[in-house]
Amino acid sequence: MKTSIRYALLAAALTAATPALADITVYNGQHKEAAQAVADAFTRATGIKVKLNSAKGDQLAGQIKEEGSRSPADVFYSEQIPALATLSAANLLEPLPASTINETRGKGVPVAAKKDWVALSGRSRVVVYDTRKLSEKDLEKSVLNYATPKWKNRIGYAPTSGAFLEQVVAIVKLKGEAAALKWLKGLKEYGKPYAKNSVALQAVENGEIDAALINNYYWHAFAREKGVQNVHTRLNFVRHRDPGALITYSGAAVLKSSQNKDEAKKFVAFLASKEGQRALTAVRAEYPLNPHVVSTFNLEPIAKLEAPQVSATTVSEKEHATRLLEQAGMK
C-alpha cells in the first residue's frame, strides 16, 4: 500500500515538474483546408492544439501591425511572401533556426534576408483553356500576348488575386514597367475580370470564355472532384522563363510578440518538415519545397515549368504593382 502511494506521489510530482505545452494561435492567410490539414497533423504529432484565425494575408498582416506587442497571434502563415516581407520590414518577426530554414529549398525559392520567415510551398501560374474551343497550338507563347484584341472577351483573369499582383511584379522585373502597364491596360480593355481564380476557372469550364489566367491548384482540385475525364478544361504551361510561368510561394513566421515561442517555432518547423509538407500536399495541389516530399496530385514536374527566377519579396515591389493596377483602372 505504502509503495503504491509512493509511486502515485512520484508520478504526480513528475507531472507537475513537466511544463504543459501551450496551445498556439495561427493567423492564417493560406487556404483554410490546407492549413487545417497541417494543423491537425501537428496536433496529432505533438499534442499542441492550434487555433486558426483565417482571413486574407494582407488583411492579417495589417492586423498584426496594428496589434503590435498585444497581438494574440503566435504564427503568421501566409499564402504570399509579400505579406511576410511587410512584417519583416516592421521588425515584428522572430528569427528562425537554421534547421527550419534549410528544410525547404530549390532554384528560385525566396529566402528571408533576416532569416525570419521560411518559404513552404509553390504554385504555378497557368492558362486554363477550353478543349472544346482550343488546342495547345492555339495558345500564346507569352502571357503578354493575351492582353490583345485577338482575345477580346475570350480571356479571363482575377485582378484581386495576390498571385495576379505577383505576376505584375514579375513582368516589371523581366520586361519593364511600361510593358507591365501596357499588359494591364490590355487585359482591362479586352479581358473579362472575375472575383476569384475559381470563378474564372468555372467560366472557362462553362464555355463563357475560352481561357483564363489562374493558379494550377484550382484546376487540380476541380479535376480531382469531378474526375479528369469529366471536365472540359486543361492546363497550359507557358514555360521558357516567361512571366506567365511564374511560381508564387507561401511561407510562415513566428511573431516576436508571441508568448509561446517554443511551440510556435515547433509549428513552423513542422510546416517545413517532411511530415508537414505531406499533410499539405495530400489536400492541395501545391508544390512541396521540401525535396524529400512528392505531391499526391499529378503535377507537372517543377523542373519542367521553366519558371522565371523572380518573385515578389519586398513591400515596395508589391506597392509598385498595386499602383500600376490603379493606373490601369483595375482598382
Curated annotation (Swiss-Prot):
Residues 1-22 form the signal peptide. It is found in: Periplasm. It comes from the Bacteria. GO terms for molecular function: metal ion binding. This is Major ferric iron-binding protein. One of its GO terms (cellular component) is outer membrane-bounded periplasmic space. The keyword Protease does not apply. Its main location: periplasm.
